[in-house]
Amino acid sequence: LMIRRPPRSTQGVSSAASDVYKRQVAGTASSRPEEDTTCFAVVDRWGNAVCQLQSIQSAWGSRLVAGDTGILLNNRMTYWHLDPNHVDCLQPGKRVRHTMNPVMMFRTESGGTDGIVGGEELVLVCGTPGADTQVQTNLQVITHLVDFGMNVAEAVEAPRWRNTHSPTESNFPHACDDLLYVENRLSPKVLAGLESKGHQLEVIGPWEASGSEVMIQIDPDEGAIKGAADPRRDGYAIGW
């Protein structure tokens, strides 16, 4: 098992897992946790895996509870558009689009010593909050992993970009700028190349792009599990 703590954290992984540290955190934690989307990923020793992404959209969602179930209903219908020419226009019987994008990636086997032919093996579980930028963030970290050979920690910590634009931005009234926000750790050559292609850039701080990616990479050949969490928020990767 390989675990990785965020580069800006001063807390060691072993001490963070201790009962003493847990009691310290419990004593200082806010009794009123922040709202917004939450994602976690879990893989156990038997290969069972979960990627859970929870969101009710706005704080308190629709502010309606389903009967006596205690389940708070979301207000994702704020994603509807009223323009009849828009693909996400409000219509009877139509399901609103949403941005929830948990990921499980599998490796297809053509054969092997285990005798499995055409089987699939789980190699990655990941996800992030971030509204419209969820797909963008997952695209970037998976590309880093698959095409550039990074491990999960490198993929999560690599410089990142994000973009939203009108009129496709999800949240009503669906109006925003059309800037490409890029972290300033990208090289000047890359920034110049983007501008030469017509992108309007907004250079932001080194860890200010969207997302709080959590990733677990499974190596079926070695039996190793590697985890990483985004240093842009308060995520953590830990194993036992």
What are the roles of these predicted feature ranges?
Residues 1-17, 21:
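Single conserved hydrophobic/aromatic residue that forms the stacking wall/gate
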Residues 11, 26, 110-118, 222, ...:
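Feature targets compositionally biased, intrinsically disordered low-complexity regions
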Residues 4, 104-105, 216:
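Short beta-strand element of the conserved SAM-dependent methyltransferase core
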Residues 15-22, 34-35, 181-240:
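Cofactor-centric catalytic regions
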Residues 3-4, 30, 228:
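Compositionally biased, intrinsically disordered/low-complexity regions enriched for serine, proline
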Residues 26-207:
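Proteins synthesized as precursors that undergo proteolytic processing into mature forms
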Residues 13, 20-21, 43, 50, ...:
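Hydrophobic aliphatic residue packing
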